[in-house]
A protein has these predicted regions:
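Conserved GNAT-fold acetyl-CoA-binding loop/helix
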Residues: 27-46
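Acyl-donor (CoA/ACP) binding surface of acyl/acetyltransferases
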Residues: 1-17, 21-26, 60-170
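A generic secondary-structure signal
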Residues: 45-48, 110
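A short helix-loop-beta-strand connector motif used in the catalytic cores of GNAT acetyltransferases and
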Residues: 47-58
């Protein structure tokens, strides 16, 4: 199988391309995720990617380095927990092509290999079937249901909780 995507850390030079992706995909992302829609918030996101408890990765097309999605690991804990929360989203122009599955797979390899995490958790709204299907393809296990778990777009939303450990990854 040929490699179609790569992952890399965002830089300030990526801000305009990210903003264009976010605006183009805004309706597609609603109500699942609300990425930055202005330059200040985008720069804040890129700055956050340099903090110890957060790792943001761009998923890019190998052919032209175009950003086709984002994978984030937030609230990274070490010591006896070694856990992070995974969030991701795609550019609407590349949805449904399997590129995000490939990119998130690379991001998980990075989290277990480079970040030395033991466990990754993904919390997904039950109506977001595409995202649930993605984590299931990647061998995540459904662990439970969290009522009114996150406030997104001004509303507290239910989520299904999925997790993957390094032992189940390889």
């Amino acid at each position: 199988m040929s490699v179609r995507v790569l992952i890399r850390k965002p830089t300030p030079a990526d801000c305009q391309e990210l903003l264009a992706l976010h605006h183009r995909s805004q309706e597609f992302h609603h109500p699942w995720v609300t990425p930055p829609l202005n330059e200040r918030d985008c720069q804040d996101y890129i700055d956050r990617c340099h903090q110890a408890d957060f790792e943001g990765l761009l998923i890019c097309h190998v052919a032209n380095d175009r950003i086709i999605g984002v994978a984030n690991f937030s609230q990274i804990f070490y010591r006896s927990f070694q856990n992070a929360y995974l969030g991701y989203y795609a550019d609407v122009d590349f949805a449904g092509q399997g590129l995000m599955s490939e990119g998130v797979r690379l991001a998980i390899d990075y989290a277990f290999g480079i970040l030395k995490l033991h466990r990754i958790e993904a919390n997904i709204q039950p109506e977001n079937r595409a995202s649930i299907d993605l984590v299931k393809r990647l061998n995540f296990t459904r662990e439970g249901f969290s009522r009114r778990y996150l406030k997104i777009d001004g509303e507290w939303r239910d989520h299904e909780r999925y997790a993957l450990t390094v032992e189940d990854w390889h």
